[in-house]
Amino acid sequence: MVKRFEDLTLQDDFMFCKVMQNPDLCKRLIEMILSDTIGKITYISIQHNINTYEQAKSVRFDVLVQTEDGKFYDVEMQVSNEKNIPKRMRFYQAAIDISFLDKGNFYNNLNDSFIIFICTFDAIGKNKPVYTFENICLEDKNTSLQDGTKKVIINAEAFKDTENKELKEFLEYLKTGKAKSEFTRRIEEMIQTVKQNEQARQEYRLMSTFEMDARYKGFSEGTYNNKCETAKLMKLKNFDIALIKEITGLPESEIEEL
């Protein structure tokens, strides 16, 4: 059953992505989670698709961000525990590396990347609000591999145990819908603004329709040909190229050639 547009919250992918399109809110959330400042955001892509090659499993990032210093941040909202987050994080990080290191470049040119999963449940099971993972030497815990990667899993269920006050209020808002801080009130205001936007409503309706059809036809695991057929139909109905790209995951250049 598709959730009504009026009932969407930050937990829902569609609304989360809409809110994260705001660079200020997106930057502040990342900094809050990492407890560190990041550079100026120069690129935000919502529902960003990466296809390494035709037969490979594709990746769709909720929010992919790049800052002026070249660092990448993937931010995911996760409400269902599919018990695969550690392996997904590994795959997502590899997809970023493969996609953004051009042929002929040196490995040292790989940009730092951060994979962040904001979960409404405890994915690790240790009752901690924040789990941060880096590669370290098992024989000498003080020695880091320094490969420029970091993975962070947030457990919103443990918001009461969160030491960072701002993060605690955000996680409480995520779980309860109660906006008590200036930051969460800004998020809630933006959500209400989105709900008043007729174009956003139509976009959600369209995406929901295609996703239901995709499940029925097996399109979620779908073939390249299915994606092309969907793109062709959408073009015939004069849908925007950017929306076709978002739904099918096909590159813009391929869509234009169809």
PLM feature spans:
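Compact structured core domains
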Residues: G148-Y173
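Short alpha-helix boundary/capping motifs
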Residues: I44-S45, S58, I154, E198, ...
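Accessory alpha/beta interaction modules
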Residues: M1-K150, K160-T162
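Generic structural signal for hydrophobic core residues of well-folded globular domains
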Residues: V19, I33, E157, L174-G177, ...
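Short, charged alpha-helical interaction segments and adjacent helix-coil junctions
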Residues: V2-E6, L10, F14, Q66, ...
